[in-house]
Regions:
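Active-site loop/turn elements of alpha/beta-hydrolase fold enzymes
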Residues: 68, 75-77, 152
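Serine-hydrolase catalytic core
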Residues: 171-183
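Short amphipathic alpha-helix adjacent to the substrate-entry channel of hydrolases
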Residues: 56-73
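Primarily recognizes the serine-hydrolase "nucleophile elbow" in alpha/beta-hydrolase
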Residues: 92-162, 173-174
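Short N-terminal helix/helix-N-cap motif within the alpha/beta-hydrolase-1
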Residues: 54-57, 80-81
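Short beta-strand element of the alpha/beta-hydrolase
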Residues: 40-49
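N-terminal cap/lid segment of alpha/beta-hydrolase-fold proteins
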Residues: 2-38
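Extracytoplasmic/secreted proteins, especially bacterial periplasmic and envelope-associated proteins
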Residues: 29, 42, 65, 85, ...
Length: 183
């Protein structure tokens, strides 16, 4: 369609430097779809759901044809890695967007972090707990226009509770719970 033709797409962009670890190098990638005929557009960084144990990056194309850039992010998955590694990957991807979106024509002041379910959890963690963006010199309070976590857990994620040998049904609020960082 004419609307879709106005979008450009680039896929498989590494947001972490190559490590030589095939798992890291294959999963720490993102796709970007952006308006080809505009500058200064807002950007949505989209983290997929899947319980932090499954899922693949995706781009909700409806946003791109409405004038947004959309960045679909893959991240490493539990139980192969710890939940903290999933969050660290989300932070690295968001930092890549902050540092690179202007080169695509996007407005770096209009970066929205969003995701569904596990992606909502990642959204909340990197946007509320400042330690995740700090290694990149980024303050989420000023770098992100908004956080949009759809159905994300605000207590400690069940995948983290599994790591700790705690039943999924037992609520835990520790340093990996977005609830601790709401301000």
């Amino acid at each position: 369609s004419a609307q879709t033709a106005a979008c450009r797409t680039e896929t498989g962009i590494a947001y972490r430097d190559a490590t030589g670890d095939g798992y890291v190098d294959s999963l720490c990638r993102l796709d970007i779809c952006w308006p080809a005929d505009r500058k200064g557009f807002p950007t949505v960084v989209w983290f997929h759901g899947g319980g932090l144990t499954g899922g693949r990056r995706e781009i909700p194309k409806a946003l791109c044809v409405k004038g947004f850039a959309v960045v679909g992010v893959d991240y490493r998955l539990a139980p192969r890695v710890k939940v903290a590694d999933c969050v660290a990957d989300a932070a690295a991807a968001a930092a890549w967007v902050v540092k690179n979106i202007a080169s695509y024509g996007g407005d770096p002041r209009l970066i929205f972090i969003a995701g569904h379910s596990a992606g909502g959890y990642l959204t909340s963690m990197i946007g509320l707990d400042k330690r995740w963006m700090a290694p990149y010199g980024i303050d989420p309070d000023t770098a992100f226009a908004a956080l949009i976590p759809y159905s994300g857990q605000v207590v400690t994620h069940f995948a983290r509770r599994r790591e700790m040998g705690i039943p999924d049904t037992q609520v835990v609020v520790d340093d990996m719970a977005p609830l601790n960082y709401i301000r």
